[in-house]
Amino acid sequence: MKTQFAILMITVVLMQMLVQTEGGILGKLWEGVKSIFGKRGLKNLDQLDDSFDSDLSDADVKLLREMFK
């Protein structure tokens, strides 16, 4: 029983170490993939940045008001 508990504790510690370093490892792998393909191969697919633009023009406000009538 003591041996099983010791093996369980060692396994838990090793799994925690793996989970904590996994982000760093996967991040480095992704940087390597991005460097292989370059900027042209991998474009920024996050198109939500434009939807959070805080500067609304008068035309934008007018369009929004017409949409929500």
Curated annotation (Swiss-Prot):
Top-rank lineage group of the source organism: Eukaryota
Subcellular localization: Secreted; Target cell membrane
Family: Belongs to the non-disulfide-bridged peptide (NDBP) superfamily. Short antimicrobial peptide (group 4) family.
Signal peptide interval: 1-23
Organism: Heterometrus petersii
Purpose of the protein: Antimicrobial peptide that acts by inducing concentration-dependent membrane disruption, implying a membrane-lytic mode of action. Acts with potent activity against Gram-positive bacteria (MIC=4.04-16.16 uM) including methicillin-resistant S.aureus (MRSA). Its activity on Gram-negative bacteria is controversial.
Domain observations: Amphipathic and cationic peptide with an alpha-helical structure.
BP GO annotations: defense response to bacterium; killing of cells of another organism
Modified residue annotations for Phenylalanine amide: F37
This protein's name: Amphipathic peptide Hp1404
Propeptide: 41-69
Gene Ontology CC annotation, any one: other organism cell membrane
Notes on how activity is controlled: Antibacterial activity is decreased by serum.
Keywords: Amidation, Antibiotic, Antimicrobial, Cleavage on pair of basic residues, Cytolysis, Membrane, Secreted, Signal, Target cell membrane, Target membrane
Tissue: Expressed by the venom gland.
